[in-house]
């Protein structure tokens, strides 16, 4: 099980991941994670500017920014994904949230099949707020059906290129197991979640009941986004969270 690292200034601890995002975050005792979803996608630069103003108006330090959900117009090549991520983390470095390639912020980044944004954009973000007696809220970062942190995703992808029912089932099982491993690292299970999201352009019904619902991953329903993971060749992604307060922002 992965060891978590505390971010006292942000009021949370995180599961170390790759330089572009952590594998998940959990609020420290006395803090609550809240989620804010944009009414429509907001391009990256404008989204970061909005988040900075929003947190300042709420009296929350930038260190409290702990997770986000992005939308991109199309899947990246491996090299393109690295270049995008270097651009993305630049703001986190400027904010002092990320140092020495250690990124505490959880993230998902997916590509809608329809109604695509013109450029990479924010869909939602999460932050911590001091609340006496609060505990237990968490966000698990998105994961596709490949081992992360390698130069070529293709070489570490489950059933690469196989979108048959059997192939998708195996991809789905891999990702569900990854979600459970990450939740275990923050002392949580499916029973603690308030929302589960899946991102795929393929039919998940053949394993929806047997694999997703049966293990408790859809106790509050399942939000299915008709979208693809952010790297060419990946077909299935999930994330989940336990967030007691959610907002809609302009």
Regions found by a protein language model. Name each.
Residues 1-250:
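Short, polar/acidic, helix-capping and beta-turn segments at strand->helix junctions
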């Amino acid at each position: 099980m992965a060891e978590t690292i505390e971010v006292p200034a942000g009021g949370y601890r995180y599961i170390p991941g790759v330089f572009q995002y952590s594998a998940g975050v959990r609020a420290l005792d006395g803090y609550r994670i809240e989620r804010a979803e944009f009414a429509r996608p907001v391009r990256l630069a404008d989204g970061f500017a909005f988040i900075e103003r929003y947190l300042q108006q709420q009296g929350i330090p930038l260190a409290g920014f702990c997770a986000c959900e992005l939308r991109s117009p199309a899947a990246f090549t491996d090299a393109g994904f690295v270049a995008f991520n270097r651009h993305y983390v630049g703001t986190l470095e400027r904010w002092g949230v990320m140092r020495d390639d250690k990124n505490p912020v959880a993230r998902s980044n997916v590509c809608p099949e329809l109604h695509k944004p013109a450029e990479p954009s924010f869909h939602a973000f999460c932050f911590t707020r001091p609340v006496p007696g609060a505990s237990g809220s968490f966000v698990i970062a998105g994961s596709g059906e490949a081992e992360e942190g390698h130069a070529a995703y293709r070489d570490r992808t489950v059933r690469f290129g196989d979108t048959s029912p059997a192939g998708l089932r195996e991809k789905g099982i891999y990702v569900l197991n990854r979600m459970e491993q990450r939740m275990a690292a923050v002392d949580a299970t499916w029973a603690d979640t308030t929302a589960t999201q899946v991102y795929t352009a393929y039919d998940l019904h053949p394993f929806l009941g047997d694999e997703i619902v049966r293990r408790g991953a859809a106790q509050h329903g399942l939000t299915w986004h008709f979208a693809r993971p952010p790297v060419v060749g990946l077909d299935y992604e999930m994330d989940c969270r336990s967030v007691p307060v959610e907002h809609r922002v302009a």
